[in-house]
Swiss-Prot record:
Classification via InterPro entries: Aldose_1/G6P_1-epimerase (IPR008183), G6P_1-epimerase (IPR025532), Gal_mutarotase_sf_dom (IPR011013), GH-type_carb-bd (IPR014718)
Pfam families: Aldose_epim (PF01263)
Entry keyword Hydrolase: no
Name of the featured protein: Putative glucose-6-phosphate 1-epimerase
Record lineage: Bacteria, Pseudomonadati, Pseudomonadota, Gammaproteobacteria, Enterobacterales
The species this protein was found in: Salmonella typhimurium (strain LT2 / SGSC1412 / ATCC 700720)
Entries under CDD domains matching the protein: D-hex-6-P-epi_like (cd09020)
EC number: 5.1.3.15
Domain of life, per lineage: Bacteria
Gene Ontology BP terms: carbohydrate metabolic process
Protein family per UniProt: Belongs to the glucose-6-phosphate 1-epimerase family.
Keyword Isomerase: yes
Active site: 164, 267
Role: Probably functions as a hexose-6-phosphate 1-epimerase.
Length: 294
């Protein structure tokens, strides 16, 4: 899918390294810079791919995800906002509406090291169908040798949220994640609380855990691709580790049957309590990703 995105015809060349393209229903922004290749969907301000020069793709994007208006994309970094997980009210979308609506590209800049982009979503008739509040939501990205993502919400409200990052791995059987802390809520086991005794999370089957006292940096150890990915979390309360395992992967229409083998989600999350935004002090959630060969 990522190769397909970069082979799409250019609709508008915004700068020498930034272009607008289209895949089915969705407008895309493609970064082709000497230091980095990346791509975004305007729907959801959704980072689809990020590849620093000399590295394998860092993010995972499903080959089966539809690029359709209003349908959440499977992979990359979905922005879950203004709620994380199932909606409190029946009939509303899981993980909020921000990932399903078109955002505006408000600013972009570039230098020798990479590209900076700012996307904006504002309250509208479309958002008030889901949520009554007035808001301005900004998503800032800095892509280069590292990837920096910051979500900033302006208004008067309480939210839960996540940067639901899907990371590309060689084989989930050979992946370990450290730095998660010890206590977690196990969503595969009736939301019971558990303890990670050795501080290392592996993924032998379906895994869905909300870590309650995570360290600032989660480290993905990938023995197959022979690299580590550092995921540094900012302004967060939790980290989520997720992999659907084989049975759920088969049941998901937007994922290949064996899709679970080649990704792990390590998510920057504010979920176990609400996060307050005020007019004076916007709420924030941020993630910095670095990759290194072992």
């Amino acid at each position: 899918m990522i190769n397909k995105i970069f082979a799409l015809p250019v609709i508008e060349q915004l700068t020498p390294v930034l272009s607008r393209r289209q895949l089915d229903d969705l407008d895309l922004i493609v970064v082709d810079h000497p230091q980095v290749k990346a791509s975004f969907a305007l729907q959801g301000a959704h980072l689809l791919s990020w590849k620093p020069v000399g590295e394998e793709e860092v993010l995972w994007l499903s080959n089966n995800t539809p690029f359709k208006t209003g349908v959440a994309l499977r992979g990359g970094v979905p922005i879950c906002w203004p709620w994380f997980g199932p909606a409190a009210q029946q009939g509303l979308p899981s993980h909020g509406f921000a990932r399903n609506l078109p955002w505006a590209l408000k600013a972009h800049n570039e230098d020798d090291n990479g590209v900076m982009l700012t996307f904006e979503l504002q309250s509208s008739e479309a958002t008030r169908k889901y949520w009554p509040h007035d808001f301005t939501l900004l998503a800032r990205f800095k892509v280069g040798k590292t990837c920096e993502i910051e979500l900033e919400a302006h208004g008067e409200f309480a939210t839960t949220s996540a940067l639901h990052s899907y990371f590309n791995v060689g084989d989930i059987a050979n992946v370990k994640v450290s730095g998660l802390g010890d206590r977690f809520i196990d969503k595969v086991n009736d939301a019971k609380e558990g303890v990670l005794t050795d501080g290392i999370q592996t993924f032998p089957d379906r895994t869905d855990r909300v870590y309650l006292n995570p360290e600032a940096c989660s480290v993905i150890h990938d023995a197959t691709l022979n690299r580590t990915i550092d995921v540094v979390h900012h302004h967060h309360l939790n980290v989520v580790g997720w992999n659907p395992g084989p049975a759920l992967s088969v049941s998901m229409g937007d994922m290949p049957d064996d899709g679970y083998k080649t990704f792990v989600c390590v998510e920057t999350v504010y979920a176990t309590a609400p996060q307050q935004a005020t007019e004076e002090k916007p709420s924030r959630l941020a993630q910095t990703i670095c990759v290194a060969k072992r």
